[in-house]
Structures are given as C-alpha cells and as structure tokens.
A protein has these predicted regions:
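Non-catalytic N-terminal regions of enzymes
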Residues: 1-185, 234-236, 240, 245-271, ...
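Non-catalytic regulatory/linker segments of enzymes
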Residues: 6-7, 45, 221-223, 228-232, ...
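A short small-residue
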Residues: 37-39, 228-236, 294-298
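Helical lid/core segments from catalytic subdomains that handle acyl or acyl-like groups
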Residues: 58, 220, 291-369, 374
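Charged, glycine/proline-rich intrinsically disordered loops and linkers
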Residues: 179-209, 335-349, 354
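Flexible, P/S/T/G-rich "lid" or insertion loops adjacent to the active sites of thioester-utilizing
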Residues: 185-242
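Short proline/glycine-enriched turn/loop segments at secondary-structure junctions
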Residues: 263-264, 284, 350-354, 387-388
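Acidic/histidine-rich catalytic neighborhood
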Residues: 273-302
C-alpha cells in the first residue's frame, strides 16, 4: 500500500525544449564515448545513517516512484517526445558501500550510467567511511531535473520525511501555452542568426580530440573554500565590477585559466561559453520535474582576457544586451520548437552550427539554492558536493556550489582535454 495516490501521478509528461536539448547531449555522449548524461549530488554526514530508514522515506515520495516507473517515447515528425508513466511497480533501492578513503566516491557508483533506456531514472547510494561518517548520493539522468529542480527535490524529500502536505501541482510541469507556427519561424531565424554569429569560428575548445581515448572515463576535482575565503571571493567579485552577484567574476576567472591553457598549447580562437539561465519565474516553487533553463551566450576574444576586471566588464555588456534583446526567452521558444524535429536531424543541426564545437568549456552554478539546506531526513548535513555530467567535447565542466556560506568548485573533466 503506497502512502500516496498513484492515480494523481501524470500518465504523460511532455519534454520541455531544454529536456530535448539534453537528449541531443545524450546522443553527443554516445558518439564521443563520453559516458552518460548523469548528475550526482553528494550529501556528507558526520555519523552513519540507516539505509533502511532512508529507503523507507524515499518509497513514500510520489516523485521518486514516478521516476522509477517511466519510459521515454521519442517523438516522430511533428510529435513531441514525452515520458510515459507505466507503473511497473519499480521501487528505489538504496545500495550500500564501504569505502576506505574518507569522502571518496566508489568507482562502482561513478561508472554506472543512467541511460534513456534504464529501468529507473534515479538511483540512491549510501557510502560508509572508516571514521563513522557517511555520504548519501543521488544520481539521475539530467533530462529530467535541472539545478533548481534538484533543490526542490530535496526540499520535497524533507517534507515527506516530516509528513507535511504538499501541492502535487508544483511537482510536475503544467499545461503549456500554445505558440503559432508563424511566431516559431520568425523567432527561429532571429535565434539562428544570433547563435551562429556568437559561435562562429574560430572558437577554441579544450576538447580537441574527436573521441575520448578511455571510453567513459571522467575525473573529478573539488576545490573547497572556507566561509572567510568565500567572503573574500564575493568582495573581489564586487571590486571587479560583477554587479549582479559573483557569476560574471567566476566565469571570468575560469576563462582566464582556459586562455592560459590555450596559449600553452599555442592555439588560436575566441572563447565561447553558453551559460544556463533559470527560466522559472522569480520565486517560483515549481515545477520539480523538467529542465526549465535557457542560456546566455558569451564570446570572449583574447584581447578581453588581459585581466579579470576587463573580462567582467566585457561579459557584463554582453549579458545586458542579451537580456535587453530577450535572448533567454527567445532561445527557450527556439528549443520548444525544435521538439518537433527528429532527434537525428536535431543533432545534425546543432553540431553543424559550431562545426562540432559545443563550447570552449562548460560553466554552471547552483547559486544560493543549496546554501540554506542544513539537514536531510532530519539529520544535519556536514557538506554538499556535486559531480556534473561531462559533455565531451569540450570535456571540462565547472560547477560552483554554495552551502552553509562556503563556496566550492566541483570540476568534472576528461584527462584527454586537461
């Protein structure tokens, strides 16, 4: 007997435009031997947790149950792809591991893929360390959840553990507004022109090889800052001219590093970085399921990389211009239109635009989404980390995460690139 009414779960959820873009990234990963489009969130605790208790809480979640009982129905021409709820009775399983190295993630977990053909689209692991501490790890296919969606997921799980009532309407995407074909076509030409100009060659990418030499291998590195160091970083961002939070400053710092790598390899080309932009309305608490991100596109020539403040200023001008032109909203409309295109043609068009170059490197940030998440399942969280999906090429992703007023940089990379 389930503690929720299964009849309330949606029988069908149409993929958003951003979801379909992640389908393209799945195809990109398969082509280049880069592993899957899997995200992992790690929660560290100072004491051992009970796998049975965690599993019992997860089994009370309608969202977790839905994620364990869906299949992808790919759209044909003029049909949108969707998730179908097929209710096979699958329930989530919490796997347990013993790890000799403190805070490390077993390769067994990192090597598991969650493909679009998997039985379950979310997995859970509990890793025990010699000190008595543990890590709870959730892995999911990125097609289903974006950064804000994962925040909402863990808030939802806390509500489940506390037996709080929840609004099911906030868990899944609601009905879409219809857009007429003329509006789609006009918008498509504007977006196509903008992106082609923004991404035109020459663009330098850290991923120069066509295929990874060791199939599926992803390396990880986490750089953690104390709360005092985080305050200094935020103060430095303001001094450098990053007016709307530290994002532009952090992108500028990453870009400086990549430009040094470019010069070290004696390569030419500008940097081109598509940066996720949350498409939810400000203060919105849903939907949990589905990607609602759009993008801002930054191109940085070498002459604008002479200093961090110079790069911040150049990025700021591009950001303001794109927001003024409504590029994030236009790109969302473009992605929504592309859902009607068969996947093979979609991939061909996307890869042709940048001549196979998806980006110089990839950057994303969870902002303050996890900063105030201090407990999970009623237990205090010591630290939160994240292992992003690796898109190859470029084969280098920076994820900035803030928890308990402490910033960390979570880096996923291919040894073939870096």
């Amino acid at each position: 007997m389930h503690p929720f009414n299964k009849s309330l779960l949606p029988k069908k959820v149409i993929l958003s435009g951003a979801d379909c873009f992640h389908l393209v990234l799945d195809k990109h990963a398969q082509k280049h031997g880069a592993g899957g489009n899997v995200m992992r969130k790690l929660f560290y605790f100072n004491k051992p947790l009970s796998a049975e208790t965690i599993e019992a809480i997860l089994k009370r979640s309608p969202v977790i149950y839905w994620l364990c009982n869906i299949r992808l129905r790919e759209g044909l021409l003029f049909q949108k792809p969707c998730w179908e709820f097929i209710d096979k009775g699958n329930e989530i399983i919490v796997r347990q591991h013993q790890c000799a190295a403190e805070n490390e993630v077993p390769r067994e977990i990192l090597g598991r893929d969650i493909s679009i053909r998997s039985e379950r689209f979310i997995e859970a692991d509990l890793v025990h360390y010699p000190s008595g501490a543990c890590a709870f790890i959730v892995s999911w296919n990125h097609i289903l959840l974006d950064a804000k969606g994962t925040t909402l997921l863990f808030e939802h799980l806390n509500a489940v553990s506390e037996n709080k009532e929840q609004d099911h309407a906030l868990l899944f995407p609601g009905p879409e507004k219809k857009t007429n074909i003329i509006t789609y076509i006009r918008n498509m030409y504007k977006v196509k022109h903008f992106v082609q100009q923004s991404a035109k060659p020459p663009v330098y990418s850290v991923g120069e090889k066509k295929k990874k030499s060791e199939e599926g291998l992803t390396a990880e590195k986490i750089i953690a800052f104390s709360s005092e160091e985080t305050k200094i970083i935020i103060a430095n961002a303001r001094k450098a001219g990053s007016r709307f939070g530290p994002t532009l400053y952090l992108i500028a710092c990453c870009s400086q590093i990549i430009d040094r790598l470019r010069r070290l390899k004696k390569r030419s080309g500008d940097l081109w970085i598509p940066v996720p932009y949350d498409g939810r309305l400000k203060g919105a608490n849903g939907p949990l399921i589905s990607n609602t991100v759009s993008f801002l596109f930054y191109r940085i020539p070498a002459q604008e990389l002479t200093s961090v403040p110079a790069t911040v200023k150049y990025l700021g001008a591009q950001m303001m211009e794109q927001i003024k032109l409504g590029i994030p909203q236009r790109y969302t409309m473009f992605l929504n239109m592309m859902r009607h295109v068969p996947l093979w043609l979609y991939y061909f068009l996307v890869s042709k635009t940048g001549k196979g170059v998806f980006a110089s490197y990839l950057y994303t940030s969870t902002g303050d989404n996890f900063n105030n998440l201090r407990s999970l399942f009623g237990e205090p969280i010591r630290d939160i980390s994240m292992i992003p999906a690796l898109t190859f090429p470029p084969g280098l992703t920076f994820v900035f995460l803030k928890h308990d007023d402490q910033l960390s940089v979570n880096i996923a990379y291919s040894p073939d690139s870096v």
